[in-house]
Amino acid sequence: MSQTPPSFIRLLNNTSLVSQILIGMIVGILLATLIPSAAQSAGLLGTLFVGALKAVAPVLVLLLVTDSIAGHKQGQKTSIRPLLILYLFGTFCAAVVAVVASFAFPSVLHLSAQNADIVPPGGIAEVLNTLLFNVVANPVKALLEGNYIGILAWAIALGLSLRKASDTTKAVIHDLSHAVSGIVKGVIRCAPLGIMGLVASTFAETGFSALLSYAQLLIVLIGCMLFVAFVVNPLIVFWKIKRNPYPLVLMCLKESGVTAFFTRSSAANIPVNMALCEKLRLPEETYAVSIPLGATINMAGAAITITVLSMAAVNTLGISVDLATAVLLSVVATISACGASGVAGGSLLLIPLACSLFGISNDVAMQVVAVGFIIGVLQDSAETALNSSTDVLFTAAACMAEDGSLSEGNLQEDADIV
């Protein structure tokens, strides 16, 4: 005779994960407001949650990609090529939006003589050089450091080598990938507690006092990201699937964007994105490659950050910018953004690269980077949410356009599950 689960467990099972996350956010804000000391302690939950996601993500990517490629049947269609085009085109469009917004609403920074103890890359060649060396990194080191370019390269090579392996070997790899996926689902169920801890500690430590002096800059930054998320990306998706894109857009923002906003890590959000792709019934051989690849090169948010902060520095110094230079800035921001995941400090440390186009010295550029760190509480969160949710969005759009693998009926059914 089966026992009835306790009422609290039933309530948890009947409440969607997104609703639980929203409750966790509210509890975190209240805790930071009423008991700041306890809120800082609660930050441990957030650190553990992000750490667990970062720990499991490299293994998940390695096994899923290896399994997908090893089990790939001759003639089976994938959507990787059109996805690469979508990723690059979407990032370039985001950079163009940021340039236009910077001309329309010029921001001015209050630069000081402070120097940051960090070293930015010397140029685009150095960024590309880092990416190429990431491809041939030691596989164990790549797993330990979360180098997803290296993990992808080794997983693809291993998968291709195992195509001629016995069915038993392929079955073992398949079972391992599903076992790790099960672990990921368990970690994701802890998201409400983790996000509560992240929100509580962030509010308790920083609040919003440091952000008020850069209100206009933040409005331009966040405004560009919202415009890309709700206007540009839907237009791109509509161009691909020829139907209303907003049910898919809103689902990706709700399930992927919300989690990414608080974890502030595209790598940590890879398991969340893969779980959403599975829920949307996308072909595993496509999303197992496209999601970790997107976490590395699909950087619309990073392109916006690089462009807006660079243009703010230009406006502050009174440098005039013509149309040709603005277009060149968009191209440089796109290429730089694709390498953001390969640079410690991400998009902010690529700002000196863009500033060098205008002859801005490294000392001044690093002051702009310092401003970026000050507003990073919101900037980095919004950037990651846009980057990560777009990975799923473009993956789903490419699959719908190529295979019709995601129908409106399936989308609505999955939306009801959330």
From Swiss-Prot:
PANTHER family xref list: PROTON/GLUTAMATE-ASPARTATE SYMPORTER, SERINE_THREONINE TRANSPORTER SSTT
GO annotations of cellular component type: plasma membrane
Swiss-Prot/TrEMBL catalytic activity: L-serine(in) + Na(+)(in) = L-serine(out) + Na(+)(out); L-threonine(in) + Na(+)(in) = L-threonine(out) + Na(+)(out)
Regions that span the bilayer: 16-36, 45-65, 83-103, 142-162, 192-212, 218-238, 289-309, 317-337, 364-384
Function: Involved in the import of serine and threonine into the cell, with the concomitant import of sodium (symport system).
This protein's name: Serine/threonine transporter SstT
Gene name of the encoded protein: sstT
Major subcellular site: membrane
Keywords, in A-Z order: Amino-acid transport, Cell inner membrane, Cell membrane, Membrane, Symport, Transmembrane, Transmembrane helix, Transport
Protein topology in the membrane: Multi-pass membrane protein
Gene Ontology terms describing biological process: serine transport; threonine transport
The family this protein is said to belong to: Belongs to the dicarboxylate/amino acid:cation symporter (DAACS) (TC 2.A.23) family.
Localization, UniProt: Cell inner membrane
InterPro entries listed in its UniProt record: Na-dicarboxylate_symporter, Na:dicarbo_symporter_sf, Ser_Thr_transp_SstT
GO molecular function: neutral L-amino acid:sodium symporter activity
